[in-house]
Every structure is written in structure tokens, then in C-alpha cells.
Amino acid sequence: MSPSPTRLAVRSVDPQKTPNLTSKAPARPSRKSEWVETTAHLRRKPCHSRHNSPAWEISGPPWSSQDHLGPHQASKPSTQRFWSPGPPLARAQAWEPIPPHQKKLCHLSSTSLPRETIASLPCKSQTLRQEVRKHWSPELFPRSPGTSDLKTLASEKTTALPLKNLCHFRSVEKNSGAIAHPQDSRESSHKSALAASSRQSRSRVRSASLPPRTRLPSGSEAPLTDHSARLSDLLLTSHATAPRWRSPDPCLRLAEPPLGSTTTPLSIWTAPQSQVMARPSKSREPQIRASAQRDPQLSEKQPRWKEALPPPLRWKEKSPLRREGTDLPPSLKQWMPSQPLLPKPSLPDLMLELLRIPRCSQIARAMPEKTGQPQERLQISSRILKNSKKPQLSAPILTEGQPQSPQPLLPSPSLKAAEIQPPSQPPRQSLPPRPSLPPGQPLSPRWSPQPRQSLPPWRSLPPGQPLSPPRSPLPGQSPLLEPIRPLEQSLAPQQCQPLLGQLPLGQPMQVHWSGEPGHSQLLPPLGHPFLPAQQLPPGQPLLPAQSLLAGQPLPPPAGPILDPPAPRSRLLTRLLRGLLRGRLPGLTSTSGAEAAAGTRHRLASARSSPPVMSRKKGPPAASSGFCGETAALACPGATRSGATQSATSSPEPSEAASVYPSVPDHDPSAPGRPRILWRRGANRCAKKPLRCESRSAQIRNAASSSTSNWRRRRWTTCVHTACCF
């Protein structure tokens, strides 16, 4: 392949030599390769005194070797670089002053150079040449003439070459070749060198070249060994000497990577992840201190974390025992271990029971003084209870002759439940009368015990001893455990409820009738706000005032407490039942049911045909009528009198009753809030459909974005369904 004539003008190619890749480079580089120059350092302005400097040699292109140049350009200083990206060119030919293609011996022998040339060299390069003559070896110069080969290239890669020396050796040998030319053509040689370098240095790559400033200052004669040590570290001479793992400063290349580094090769770039780290590293990467998650080498240490977890568990296992063993008085300690299967009582339970013990003994001491009229009532009610509740009791009632199986006095609720659930066991003594008392209510004198019962010793018995029970489980015992009831209920409601003879928790309400109007008592669901005046809400501990109340006879409050609860209980059960059924409480007769059905239908119709009501004015007369009527049905006045209001009745009495909860015509102890809420709920249900409808109509007509339309409409429908369901 012969080069084009334009190329021949620039460069004469040796015909015997097979052109290698570097000789194929175009004389006029294409546009594409021009941008590469921007990465390289700028070329310096030509200056005669710096003619010999390695900057020239550096900026020269890799393929411009002197053996290819014609005689016209023989005077150009050589620009071949030893680290050229292409394969090394055989330096078979060196320059004589006259014939272009004569072969020559080693350049560095000073005999081959004319005297004037050696004289014209700067003193630095002369000293360099002398040193080279002493220390020169083919190892140092892999491209010395005749040895340039692939082998030497490999050896060059293995050997880190001190760059600075090489620059000077090259400049010496090239300049010596160039300056051998007669001195008169100095100008032309300079111009041609400029042209060639500017033409061909464009495709030079920055990473292959050295910036010119790494050159020694021209006057200095620093010892070469220092430079070889320092420069080989600071400058990446060949591809092989490039550091195997990157680090911010090359002096640390030989330091081994820090201990816990995530990636061993990129040790300093990545933040060290060792657990031993005393201070956060200065790397910009966010620090994870002693992170076992991110560090693969710490996976073996992970089990330590898992071992660290069990001690709290062990402590938890130990803690109930500790509570049982140490925190309890001896009386409680005896029965505590006897509950193997049951959940361990929590600390509040035990505290409450401890609180309870002295109070109960006080009550027992105070008991025998109470005698008189309430006892007769007690006997009557207990007889009635025996008759009415016999089907509910699971075992025969104890008589005086039977010894009672020794049972702990104050068992935890779980124990009680365990005793009561197997039906074969005799029930606790206090079972039968218990239903006739609201759960938390403290003693009222009607429950005072009969004097023949040996109650105080029973109260103070240690749990293990057998009890000598009275003839029948008269309610006289119930006061002993009565003050305890709210606490136990608060502790374990599910277990106490079967005790009380109630239905399980799911069912709303149970009323126990003992035959007399005074004894019908409702056991409201736990947490219910409607408790009588003396009754404890189940969450509270016993207050001292209430324990006092329990301990002493209180004749005056007995009257009001005894009588009103009957209608209230009826009302509450009806309310709840109505809530479950159709949300219309208080219907006692079929006519009332029909009326309710009528109102329900009317409610539905009002919901389906809202335009009758306008948003601003509220519901029309008919709807207000039935609103008031639902409120009237909700109000307990109607229930208590047993009269039901018809569907067309006017709302006045019910409004009076519901707006003023303390109006004296219904029982004062019943709280008034539910009625107001009920009333409000009915009104809201009546008005809601129209409000929703009108607003959605407004929105439909409004010119707003579709999304907000949709959102608002969806919201109104949600509210509508929630409130009016």
C-alpha cells in the first residue's frame, strides 16, 4: 500500500519496511480527532533556547519517527516518545550529516557525534550523557537501538522507569541527531518541527503524556537516584505500575488497606467499616459506625447479637416467680403456686388484692352490728333467688352440714374462673346472690349479714383452712366480697361475668329480677358510664371513702338507691336491644312497634326523596315530627310510664325531657346524656340526606374541576353512609 503523493511530500516511507499502524496516520487529521487536543496541556510558544527541552519531544506525535522523514526534514528535532501508545518503532536508522539512510552505531557513543554538537549541548544534558555512559544498561533503555522488541516492551512494563532520566536521555539522543545537521538550516528545521508537531499532536491523549512542568529546572543537577525514587511513585510511568487499588494519595499505595474495609481494593475511598473505629473517618461517604449489616466480614460476629437477646427473656421468665415469691404476703403466697395453668397475675392485680385484704377485714368486723329490717328483705330475696335461679346454678346449694372444699379466700380472677368453669364443682358461696347486685356497688344495709354467721373468723382465715359455711348461701356473704367486685371485674371481665350469672360478654345486657321491685338490678356492661352514685367504675381502685361506706351501715341512702334502678335497667336494656335490632328503642307494645315501623319507613322515604327538605330551612314539619318522635321513643319517660307515643304525636314532651336531663319527672339517677345524643343522632339522620343531596347538586352545577368534583362527591357519600347507615 503506497501512500498518497501528498503524504510522500511530507514523509518518505521506507519501501522495504512494512508500514505499521503508526505510519498509517493521516497527514491532515480529521475533524473528529481535533477535540482530543483540548484535554492535553497547551503547547508552548516556540523558543530557540528551549529547542532541546523535553516539552518538544512530549508534544510531538507518536508516529513521527526520524527514520520515516525525508531529507527535507532531517533537521527537525525528533518527537518520538518512549511511552507512545503504538508499538515501538525499530530505530534501525540514525542520522549522518550528509547521506539520509546511512546506518549508524549507538547514538550515545560520543564518538559518533561531531564536536560542535557536543559543545552546543547544555551542560545538564552533557552530565546526563556521562552518567548514562557509566550506568547504561539495556534494562534501563528498553528502546535502545536494536533491542526494541515486544520482550523489551514487557520488561518496560514490569520495570518502573524513572521518567525524568528518560526524558533527558531521549532529548539528548534526539537532539544529538538533529544538531548533527549543519548549523545554517537551524531556522528551517525549527519551522518544520513546528509544523509537524502542530499537525500531529492533535490526536495525542492526555493520559499518555506528561505535563511539561515535571521537568527539572534546567540549571539544577539533582542526584538522579532521588528522582527515580520520587518520580516513579508520583507519576504513573507505565500501565503496569498504575496502582492496583486506588487511593487518594499515591504515597499510601503500599500501605495495606485498613482493617474492616468493605472492599479490600478500594480501601481508603470507602469509609472504613471496622467496629474498632474510634472516630468517624474523614471520608465523605456517610459513616455507619460499627455497622455489622454492611460489612461482609462481620457476618461471623453476628451471633453475638443474637446471644445478647436472651437475657431479657430470662429475666421475664424469672420475673413472675420473683413477683410471686417475694412481693406477696405469706397468706397470698400459699395459694399462688396452686394455679399452674393460669396466666400469671400482673403486678397491679396483686397490688389491688393487697389493698383489698385489710378493707375486707374491716368490713367483716363491722358486719355483725348490722341487723334489723334489711335482713328480712334479704331472706325474702334469697328465697326468691333460689327459686328463680336454680336452673342457672350448676350444682346444689351448700347446706350447713357439708364441709366446703378448702378454697383460697381471695383468689385471683383467673382462679375463680377455673373453679367455676367445671360444672361438677360446688359453686362459690357468694354465687347465688351475686346477680342481684350491680357489679361494683358497695354494700348497702339491706345486705347486712345475720348475726349468727361467724363471719369475722371466716374473713380472717388463712386460705388453706376449711370454712364452716352457714346453712344456705345467704346474701350475707356477698358483702364480704362485694367491695372486691369492681376490682376483679376490672382485672378479668370475661372470667367474672360467668360468676355473676350473666350472659357472656358478647350479649348486651342482663337484668336479674329477684321478685321485688327494689331488687331488680341491671348489671351494665363493663366500662359503662351509667353506674349508680355509690358504684365504682370498674377501672378505679377502692377509694377510702367508699371503703368507709362499705364498712358502716348507711340507712339514709338505701331508699333512693334501692327503688329507681328497675325502670332504668329496663330502659337501658331496651335501648341496647333496640340499637342491635333496629335502632328504635322504647317500644313496649305492638302499636309502638307499628309506629316504629312507620317511622322507619318514613325515614327511608325521606332518605330516598331528599328534595322535599331545603338545605337552609331544615326538615319540613312532618320530618321534624318524626324526628321528635324518635327522640321521644328514646326518652325514658315514655318507657317508664309504659305508654307509647303514636307516630303522629308531637315532640314537645320528649323534647322537654331530652333537652333538660335533670327534669324531675323522670328518675334523677339516670344520666341524661344518652338521650341528648340519641335525639341529636335522630335529627342528624333526618337532615343528612337533604344536605348531601343539595350539596352534590350544587357541585354538579358548579364549574369546578372534575377531580375536585369527584373528590367532594365521594366524600359526601362517605359521610352520608357513615352517619345515616
UniProtKB/Swiss-Prot annotation:
UniProt-annotated stretches for the region Disordered: 1-93, 177-226, 256-340, 396-481, 508-528, 584-624, 638-675
GO biological process: adenylate cyclase-activating dopamine receptor signaling pathway; adenylate cyclase-activating G protein-coupled receptor signaling pathway; cartilage development; cellular response to glucagon stimulus; embryonic cranial skeleton morphogenesis; embryonic hindlimb morphogenesis; endochondral ossification; energy reserve metabolic process
Polar residues bias spans: 260-276
UniProt biased composition (Pro residues): 423-442, 459-473
An annotated Gene Ontology molecular function: adenylate cyclase activator activity
Bilayer topology: Peripheral membrane protein
Subcellular location(s) of the protein: Cell membrane; Cell projection, Ruffle
UniProt keyword annotation of Membrane present: yes
Descriptive protein name: Protein ALEX
Phylogenetic placement of the source organism: Eukaryota, Metazoa, Chordata, Craniata, Vertebrata
Designated gene of the protein: Gnas
